[in-house]
Amino acid sequence: MSGAYRGRGFGRGRFQNWKRGRGGGNFSGRWRDRTDLSKAAGNHASEQASQPLLQQSTLDQFIPYKGWKLYFSEVYSNNSPLTEKIQAFEKFFTRHIDLYDKDEIERKGSILVDFKELTKDNEITNLIPDIENALRDAPEKTLACMGLAIHQVLTKDLERHAAELQAQEGLCNGGGTMVNVPHIYARVYNYEPLTHLKNIRATCYGKYISIRGTVVRVSNIKPLCTKMAFQCAACGEIQSFPLPDGKYNLPTKCPVPACRGRSFTPLRSSPLTVTMDWQLIKIQELMSDAQREAGRIPRTIECELVHDLVDSCVPGDTVTVTGIVKVSNSEEGSRSKNDKCMFLLYIEANSVSNSKGQKAQTAEDGCKHGTLMEFSLKDLYAIQEIQAEENLLKLIVNSLCPVIFGHELVKAGLMLALFGGSQKYADDKNRIPIRGDPHVLIVGDPGLGKSQMLQAACNVAPRGVYVCGNTATSSGLTVTLSKDSSSGDFALEAGALVLGDQGICGIDEFDKMGNQHQALLEAMEQQSISLAKAGVVCSLPARTSIIAAANPVGGHYNKARTVSENLKMGSALLSRFDLVFILLDTPNEQHDHLLSEHVIAIRAGKQRAVSSATVSRVLSQDSNTSVLEVVSEKPLSERLKVAPGEKTDPIPHQLLRKYIGYARQYVHPRLSTEAAQALQDFYLELRKQSQRVGSSPITTRQLESLIRLTEARARLELREEATKEDAEDIIEIMKHSMLGTYSDEFGNLDFERSQHGSGMSNRSTAKRFISALNSIAERTYNNIFQFHQLRQIAKELNIQVADFENFIGSLNDQGYLLKKGPKIYQLQTM
């Protein structure tokens, strides 16, 4: 080991902060023995009472642990039970010292100890048979024993290597080498079992527990004083007084026996005053199926982070916090100071494990996993059994929301959003990350089950957040900057998109959000949320798939208008959705009969109705739209339907959630050459057709959507390669989406109808009207028109529109006309 240290420059670079010198700048001055240290401290000793220091130095010579006073306040005793624990931990760390990075220990001032390794070590369990109970019931003493043990191991290791270096350089070593190792904290992780927040009661006070939750609030980092220097007003004696938990307190007496001073002045700039970094975070519980309670808001608890733990998480992260339960005085209430007896529980964190920061789970090309889940052996067997199903896509799609009849392709789109594609270059600083999360929008008439499918998708997701658009605010979706009542500082509180990081965010009533749409633009494409409020400028991750449901304006979807006109929504937001499904309530005798059977069977409490099928809308297609004709013998929509008389056994949501979490965590598909070629051919054909009619609604966003969804289709079956069949399935789903988006009221595909353009089936009407206005404005030198003038001009041109006000409003939205006042418009094309 010494050779390795010398090879890496141990003597001159490594641990150089731990070698304290009082003399000159040469090497011998940096390595002083104890006699030199006492001489160097002579001036300070003259100010102190000499007799107590002499007794203390005499006692220190008999303590085998040089850092004893850093960890324990009591006097050292060979017969103390603490000594046995320290010796056992010292042997453990000596055996495993090669596994630890000493540079990192020096930089952080702490060492990570795996609790599972401790309990599996035979020697530790023999020497300390009740180590689990000792850590749980007396955590401070046990952690101090671990810290002193690693302190002693590193001190001996450094002294040995320093002696070797001195011998190599021919320096004399008079009275032994003095190595000053600072306080090292033992951080225990992988502690089990996890404690639910609802079980943290008064009985947990002083216990060592582990919790898991989502960070919803992070405070600023502040200095916390642990030791304060006080000067006696009578004799001028300076003493260092400990402040437990950072609570300010005054000494009761002067350390000089002859002095009776009771007045002390704090010396904040004294070298005897010790401060440390301190941060407060708020953890919100993660709700599983067994823990969901109706009508109760999620519980939260505050955690204190100190030293190297500060700045280890941001709002939205899923963290596992291990620490000691403590109490603090409640600052609330109008009672007097002496009457307060209310206490609040909080956790003094010992270790923080951030799911986002586990780099070992990152794939080689920069693909990033979702929130880490734990899988038992039973879960893995169930996942293996699900994957072995013959028609897996059909089973999973029909397990999403069995209560809703039909809409198989819409459910398939939602399931693809749950699985998601692979995010590329997530950790590469030199490249822009490519998002892998698809976004899905469902638009349709009321009463078709959009909200139920949305809630089912959020329930199945390993991490899902469901919000309603008409009650959500812009800050509630993104980030809230709140002011702390006690300190007056601003703190970040995560909104729905940040809490849904690496998961799903379902937004219902998407059309009733008002101006909150603008908050989604950055989150949907850049996968982050930037904040600039009250002097705070920061960016938080929001890598979430957004699935939204919306009702059209007027209550019924008008096919004569585009999606943008039906929703009164901007084109920038609509173009970010990978799939836009249009659900129409069209009367159909066969479909209505099957649907009524299904609803009656569910109401009667029976199993799923035996007859389950849907009848797709048959749209007339002209010869120019051959690319959207289904060429396979049995299309995906037919393969996903449950045949009459066929019995299905849906996967329970709890198990389906585990399956999705496993796929997102461990499966990272790649496109095969055949799949890439199929997607490219489909995209180029779409571009060719859209250019042929003089418009270009097809962009590279559609190609990226195809790639994302194809990767999700392969991930659904736990495959590492996306095949041509996957690409064909995605092309069919995309066709189904486009049939609703680009078809007009006659069922014909019109590529001039972009999602955000005019909804007229014949745009020449608008062009003819604007051309007439141009000629009138040039002739009269006036480009201002009253509404009744516009109506008269349209009547003269014999322009027949169903709603003239909407027609003018459409021209206003597209920038041809500018509304200058009530019923007054200005022509913009002159």
Swiss-Prot record:
| Chief location bin | nucleus
- Gene Ontology MF annotations: ATP binding; ATP hydrolysis activity; chromatin binding; enzyme binding; helicase activity; MutLbeta complex binding; MutSalpha complex binding; MutSbeta complex binding
Entry EC no(s): 3.6.4.12
Q: Which GO terms describe its cellular component?
A: chromosome; MCM complex; MCM8-MCM9 complex; nucleus
Entry keyword set: ATP-binding, Cell cycle, Chromosome, DNA damage, DNA repair, DNA replication, DNA-binding, Helicase, Hydrolase, Nucleotide-binding, Nucleus, Phosphoprotein
Q: Which SUPFAM superfamilies match?
A: Nucleic acid-binding proteins, P-loop containing nucleoside triphosphate hydrolases
Q: Which CDD domains match?
A: MCM8 (cd17759), MCM8_WHD (cd22247)
Q: Name one Pfam family in it.
A: MCM_lid
Q: Where in the cell is it found?
A: Nucleus; Chromosome
Q: What class of enzyme is it?
A: hydrolase
Origin, by domain of life? Eukaryota
Reaction(s) catalysed by this chain's protein = ATP + H2O = ADP + phosphate + H(+)
Do the record's keywords include Coiled coil? no
A GO BP entry is: double-strand break repair via homologous recombination
Location of Phosphoserine modifications:
S620
Assembly and partners are described as: Component of the MCM8-MCM9 complex, which forms a hexamer composed of MCM8 and MCM9. Interacts with the DNA mismatch repair (MMR) complex composed at least of MSH2, MSH3, MSH6, PMS1 and MLH1. Interacts with RAD51; the interaction recruits RAD51 to DNA damage sites. Interacts with the MRN complex composed of MRE11, RAD50 and NBN/NBS1. Interacts with CDC6 and ORC2. Interacts with HROB; the interaction recruits the MCM8-MCM9 complex to DNA damage sites.
Function of the molecule: Component of the MCM8-MCM9 complex, a complex involved in the repair of double-stranded DNA breaks (DBSs) and DNA interstrand cross-links (ICLs) by homologous recombination (HR). Required for DNA resection by the MRE11-RAD50-NBN/NBS1 (MRN) complex by recruiting the MRN complex to the repair site and by promoting the complex nuclease activity. Probably by regulating the localization of the MNR complex, indirectly regulates the recruitment of downstream effector RAD51 to DNA damage sites including DBSs and ICLs. The MCM8-MCM9 complex is dispensable for DNA replication and S phase progression.
Q: Spell out the protein name for this chain.
A: DNA helicase MCM8
Provide the species name: Rattus norvegicus
